[in-house]
């Protein structure tokens, strides 16, 4: 199954905003997001739903909303997701509309870390209320070097991630802003500036 392409009626313009991050694995996206969440920007991370079991000390409603595969399918049928993906049989990930609306209603600017298709879907749903950012590695060779440097994946997994990254990079023009992460501190500063401008915060 491919990620859903279903788009529902956009939300009316409000004060709180939506900030979407997508990127290939190894681009430094998570590091940049964690840096931004630590700034005083009233940002709140969007908690995804998943049908996989909790790992270790993971708690429902903290790391993820844990649903059974049948519960996930029922919520899909009820059109409760902004976006979702079945990565393989019975292993779903997605973003629940009600949770995001709850955060926005509380005045929080909601940050998403999603795949490129999910990012495009959320941007379509929220329109001008959303800023979509694509974090891009300087080149595929550098991405391969970073993935090898992690020391967590087999060569086969790394090549699979590289192939996926080449597909994901083709989506970059669909995003509002592309931030090239060839230097992490520069990329963090660039992302901070772009988000402050979007939120109407003085960047001086």
Curated annotation (Swiss-Prot):
- Where does this protein reside within or beyond the cell? Cytoplasm
Q: Which UniProt keywords apply?
A: ATP-binding, Cytoplasm, Kinase, Nucleotide-binding, Transferase
| One cellular-component annotation, GO | cytosol
Q: Does the keyword Metal-binding apply?
A: no
Q: Where is the Guanylate kinase-like domain?
A: 16-196
> Which residues bind ATP per the record?
23-30
Name the reaction it catalyses: GMP + ATP = GDP + ADP
Q: Which Pfam families match?
A: Guanylate_kin
Where's it mainly located? cytoplasm
Q: List the disulfide bonds.
A: none
Q: Which CDD domains match?
A: GMPK (cd00071)
Instruction: Name the NCBIfam families for this protein.
Output: guanyl_kin
Q: What does this protein do?
A: Essential for recycling GMP and indirectly, cGMP.
Provide the protein name.
Guanylate kinase
Q: Which organism is it from?
A: Bacteroides fragilis (strain ATCC 25285 / DSM 2151 / CCUG 4856 / JCM 11019 / LMG 10263 / NCTC 9343 / Onslow / VPI 2553 / EN-2)
**Coding gene?**
gmk
């Amino acid at each position: 199954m491919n990620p859903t392409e279903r788009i529902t009626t956009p939300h009316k313009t409000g004060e709180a905003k939506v900030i979407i991050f997508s990127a290939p694995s190894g681009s430094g996206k998570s590091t940049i997001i964690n840096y931004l969440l630590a700034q005083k920007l009233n940002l709140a991370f969007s908690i995804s739903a998943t049908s996989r079991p909790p790992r270790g000390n993971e708690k429902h409603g903290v790391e993820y909303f844990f649903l059974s595969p049948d519960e996930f399918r029922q919520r899909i049928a009820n059109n409760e997701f902004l976006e979702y993906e079945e990565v393989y049989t019975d292993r779903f990930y997605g973003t629940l509309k009600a949770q995001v609306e709850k955060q926005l209603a509380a005045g929080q600017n909601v940050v998403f870390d999603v795949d490129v298709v999910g990012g495009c879907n959320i941007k379509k749903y929220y329109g001008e209320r959303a800023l979509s950012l694509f974090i891009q590695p300087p080149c595929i060779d550098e991405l391969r070097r970073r993935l090898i440097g992690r020391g967590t994946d087999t060569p086969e997994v790394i090549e699979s991630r590289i192939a996926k990254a080449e597909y994901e990079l083709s989506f970059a023009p669909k995003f509002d802003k592309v931030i090239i992460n060839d230097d992490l501190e520069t990329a963090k500063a660039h992302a901070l500036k772009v988000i402050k401008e979007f939120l109407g915060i003085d960047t001086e």
